[in-house]
Design a protein with these regions (language model features):
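Flexible, P/S/T/G-rich "lid" or insertion loops adjacent to the active sites of thioester-utilizing
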Residues: 1-21, 111, 219
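Histidine-centered acyl-transfer/condensation active-site motif
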Residues: 3, 21-23, 167-190, 195
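His-Asp-centered acyl/peptidyl-transfer active-site segments
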Residues: 15-24, 28, 38-151, 183-188, ...
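Short amphipathic C-terminal alpha-helix that caps PH/PH-like domains
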Residues: 85-92, 191-205
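Residue-level signal for inorganic ion chemistry
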Residues: 99, 164, 191
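Low-complexity, glycine/alanine/valine/leucine- and proline-rich hydrophobic stretches
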Residues: 143-172, 181
Length: 220
């Protein structure tokens, strides 16, 4: 787990509020730009996990209602950072309307339509989940300033090379980046490297949203 302090987290949240985007969009932009920087390809896909409990009936249904879909982005280096983020936002809004579709059926269909040379290969290097559990709001004060705590636990089964969960800490509203990974596929050193550049890309983009992706990659 990597911890981002409260003050820099607030800078990211302020950017999201100013430009009317979710932090999930900014995280996805940072991740796909990191892979674009590392691999030199404009076409990057990341699995996006969605906690789908849209109705009261679903909220009380029990069990797991997590759906995962690949989110593909194709941005050349001359695209402005903010324009790419807006594109991600609009495409997410379009995709999430269908988030109740069975992801297992989708991946089975894709494997038949676009077969890989051997089993186990995929287009996506990792998966992302953002848990928007920011409860530092006035509502808690109205209820007597109820204290709460959260903790992230892996379930012991890592079926993919890398899975990132980003959550807010209840004590200061900073961000925790929790990586679940297969140790033979991704090392701790590689995770540190990715986290370092992910943050640099997000902050550079938030500070200079008019810069192009290529300019940000050079600056970080």
């Amino acid at each position: 787990i990597f911890h981002l302090e409260a003050e820099p987290t607030k800078r990211l949240m302020d950017f999201c509020e100013k430009y009317h985007i979710s932090l999930a969009c900014l995280l996805l932009m940072g991740i796909r730009t990191f892979f674009q920087k590392e691999n030199g390809f404009d076409d990057v896909s990341v699995n996006n996990a969605i906690a789908r409990r849209a109705t009261l009936k679903e909220k009380k249904s029990g069990g797991t209602r997590i759906h995962s879909f690949p989110f593909r982005t194709c941005f050349s280096k001359d695209v402005r950072f903010i324009d790419a983020v807006y594109t991600i936002r609009d495409k997410q809004n379009e995709l999430f309307r269908h988030a109740n579709y069975n992801p297992t059926e989708y991946f089975a269909l894709r494997s038949k339509t676009y077969p890989q040379p051997k089993a186990g290969l995929t287009y996506e290097p990792m998966s992302l989940t953002y848990q928007p559990m920011t409860l530092k709001e006035k509502g808690l004060n109205d209820l007597g300033d109820i204290k709460y705590k959260t903790k992230w636990y892996p379930n012991g089964m890592t079926t993919q090379a890398m899975y990132l969960t980003v959550m807010h800490r209840p004590e200061d509203n900073g961000l925790d980046f929790s990586f679940e990974h297969q140790v033979k596929a991704v090392s701790r050193k590689q995770l540190e490297y990715m986290y370092y550049y992910l943050c640099k890309i997000m902050f550079k983009g938030a500070e200079n949203p008019e810069l192009t992706i290529g300019e940000i990659i050079k600056l970080v």
